[in-house]
Curated annotation (Swiss-Prot):
<dbReference type="GO" id="GO:0090729">
    <property type="term" value="F:toxin activity"/>
</dbReference>
<comment type="subunit">
    <text>Associates with activated host C3-convertase complex C3bBb (C3-CFB). Interacts with host properdin (CFP), a regulator of the alternate pathway of complement.</text>
</comment>
<dbReference type="GO" id="GO:0005576">
    <property type="term" value="C:extracellular region"/>
</dbReference>
<keyword id="KW-0800">Toxin</keyword>
<dbReference type="InterPro" id="IPR056799">
    <property type="entry name" value="ALL3/gSG7_salivary-like_helix"/>
</dbReference>
<feature type="disulfide bond">
    <location>
        <begin position="107"/>
        <end position="117"/>
    </location>
</feature>
<keyword id="KW-1015">Disulfide bond</keyword>
<comment type="function">
    <text>Salivary protein that potently inhibits the alternative pathway of complement system activation in the host while having no inhibitory effect on the classical or lectin pathways. Binds and stabilizes activated host C3-convertase complex C3bBb (C3-CFB) and inhibits its convertase activity. Enhances accumulation of C3bBb on immobilized properdin.</text>
</comment>
<dbReference type="Pfam" id="PF25001">
    <property type="entry name" value="Aegyptin_C"/>
</dbReference>
<feature type="signal peptide">
    <location>
        <begin position="1"/>
        <end position="26"/>
    </location>
</feature>
<protein>
    <recommendedName>
        <fullName>gSG7 salivary protein</fullName>
    </recommendedName>
</protein>
<keyword id="KW-1216">Complement system impairing toxin</keyword>
<keyword id="KW-0732">Signal</keyword>
<feature type="disulfide bond">
    <location>
        <begin position="84"/>
        <end position="139"/>
    </location>
</feature>
<keyword id="KW-0964">Secreted</keyword>
Length: 142
């Protein structure tokens, strides 16, 4: 009996460790894929730094972090739709362009390129990013 326990116990422990490592590995792969795709977002560095900070912060908090939380919970067998994420990234450029226009030449009540214009345009920008997240969430799995 003691011999069986010395053989079975290490095998049981190895099986438990293997079962715990597999979902974490898959989650890391899904997260790594999403982060790689988000790193392809290239905003124009010639724009004002406080504008770029606001634009990047919106993308990070309204898109990247929520999507990473979702794909981090996917099982290893789940297929992540890279096309869905790439489509979302192309729409990010359109939303960011709209944000920039409201911050710069389309600003009505304040001087163009001012912090006041940025504040006025930010709410609409974040709302559009949240809507994009809701759309993207529906198509993340293939």
């Amino acid at each position: 009996m003691a011999v069986r326990m010395t053989v079975i116990l290490p095998l049981a422990m190895a099986l438990i460790c293997l079962m715990q490592a597999e979902p974490a590995t898959a989650a890391n792969n899904h997260i790594r894929t999403v982060l790689k795709l988000f790193r392809t977002i290239d905003l124009d560095d010639s724009k004002k730094s406080f504008y770029l900070t606001a634009a990047k912060y919106g993308i990070q908090t309204q898109l990247r972090e929520p999507i990473i939380r979702i794909v981090g919970g996917y099982l290893p067998s789940t297929k992540l739709s890279e096309a869905c994420v790439k489509n979302m990234i192309s729409e990010v450029y359109e939303i960011e362009g709209d944000f920039y226009s409201k911050f710069s030449y389309a600003c009505e009540d304040h001087a163009p390129y001012s912090v006041e214009c940025l504040e006025d345009a930010r709410d609409d920008y974040l709302t559009q990013l949240v809507e994009l997240f809701k759309e993207t969430k529906k198509c993340l799995r293939e």
